[in-house]
Structure formats: C-alpha cells, structure tokens
Amino acid sequence: MDTSSINAQSIFDDNAAMLKLSWLTGHEGWERGFSADTVANATSSADLVGHLNLIHPNRIQVLGEAEIDYYQRQTDEDRSRHMAELIALEPPFLVVAGGAAAPPELVLRCTRSSTPLFTTPMSAAAVIDSLRLYMSRILAPRATLHGVFLDILGMGVLLTGDSGLGKSELGLELISRGHGLVADDAVDFVRLGPDFVEGRCPPLLQNLLEVRGLGLLDIKTIFGETAVRRKMKLKLIVQLVRRPDGEFQRLPLESQTVDVLGLPISKVTIQVAAGRNLAVLVEAAVRNTILQLRGIDTLRDFMDRQRLAMQDPDSQFPGKLV
C-alpha cells in the first residue's frame, strides 16, 4: 500500500474538526508519516496509535493527563532525558490530550526537530479510539471489482459475469422489484473488519446504472431515494454464465466461495438462457443464502434423507424439508 499520502497534514485535516485539534508547533514536519515497513509490520491500528510508550518508535504518541502528571513529578534530569528519547523516536506527530498544557521543554524540542505537536481538550482515550478507527479505515485492504452491486433483501449481492450477459438489465429488474442499487460497473471494496468486506460506489458513478440501448440511468431520480444505497457488506456473489447444459452442475455438492480481500464470500452460479426469470432466481439464491447463514442447508438435509432412505427403504419422511 502507498503510504506517501498519509502524513501529519492529512491526518490533521481529516480529524481536526471531530477531535478539536490545534496545531501548536512543528509545522515544518507536515510530511511526517509512516514508513511502508511500519505499516506492513503493524498487526492492527493499535500498533500505530497509542498512549505514550518509548518502546514503540514511529508511532503516534498521545500524552494524556496521567502522562503529563507523571512528567511533572520527575526531576529536571529525568524530564530532559524522557523528552529527548521521545523526540528521538521520530513519531509522525504528538498529541497532548485532555486539555493539559504542553510542557515547555516538549514544545521547544518539537519546534527544533520539526515534530508536529497537536493539542486537544478531548480525553486521551477518546483521541486514541478515534485515530485508531481512522487509521484502520485508510489502511484497510482495498480492491475494485467489476459487476453490479445491489442490496437484495438486506444482503449485499454482487452480480458478475462476462460482458453482454445482461447484468445491468438484471440489476434494473431487481431495482424495479424494490431492491437497491449500490454501484454499477466498478465497485470499490474495502475490508474494514476481520469478518466483513464493505462495498461502495465510486463518487463519479454514484446512483448511475448503464443499460445497453438506454444509456446512463439516474436510479435515484427515476425510482426515488429508497432505490439507492451508500454502502453494503458483501455477502453473496452471483455469477452469470452462458454454457451448454452438459457443462452445468445442477446440484453442486460443495458450497462455492470466492476469495475477496482474503475473506471467503459465498458464490452461486446461474446459467443465462432464454425464458429464465433471472430476477426470481437471484432472489431465491439470496433467500437460500440467508437460510444457510442461519444454519439451514436444504441440500444437506436432502442428502441426509437420501442416505436414510437407502438404509431403510420403509422409512417415512415429512412433506417439507425444514
């Protein structure tokens, strides 16, 4: 990941209003940031932002009331030594939180070394939590995938397939049935947590759907505010294919998944053929996926019935699967 654009200036601009930050000194060091190695070796954003800790170099150091109080109780010699060690770590910037006054020696050393020094009336814990969330978002793994991303029955579904299979037309049909559009053609995905991937629409394509023969359609204007979504978690990928019947597996015995940013995402394959109601099939696939997430697997239940029937031909089964 390119970390060159992540520096003291960009972090300050993005968080100054929310965290009530003031830039006290060290303006010349606005380009300070994280090295690629530091980001690569970080297991989480907690490695990049935290309370004052002289063991962790290249880290955003936050000094709260407890740290300032401890500093005030030190001898002049210890104060000077601690401040020298802190500046020698070359942090991207320092934050004095909790409305505490920045120690004069710290201000002087930051000025001389061009180390950005911020102050805020907010508590150190609140600043750390907010900056960790911010860092986790901007450093999260990202990818752009081709397809139509929709909200179907509250589930994020990506329609994929070769060009000309009718993905956009299918998306338009699903939107007309009350579902919502997130993005068409290019979908930006980011892994924001250990167990979910979130998809958004690039600003340039917001609310737009391209349909052959009709051109660009503004879905929000045509269908209303409820027909579009800002973002959704990706839960299912529906791949549209056109192939001879002999190559198509009617009952896949194993669940299919696709790796997206290191996370396995459920996948179903739907064959495109004349006369097939693809919108109904996609809705059924989504409903079936919802059942699977709840622990209900229709195919597995059928296979269990089949095995029991082979073992005991006289056994009776209920009229429904669940």
Swiss-Prot record:
GO MF term (any one): ATP binding
Presence of the UniProt keyword Disulfide bond in the record: no
Record-linked Gene3D superfamilies: HprK N-terminal domain-like (3.40.1390.20), P-loop containing nucleotide triphosphate hydrolases (3.40.50.300)
EC number: 2.7.11.-, 2.7.4.-
Binding, ATP: G161, D162, S163, G164, L165, G166, K167, S168
Note, other: Both phosphorylation and phosphorolysis are carried out by the same active site and suggest a common mechanism for both reactions.
Protein name listed in UniProt: HPr kinase/phosphorylase
Organism: Burkholderia mallei (strain ATCC 23344)
Gene: hprK
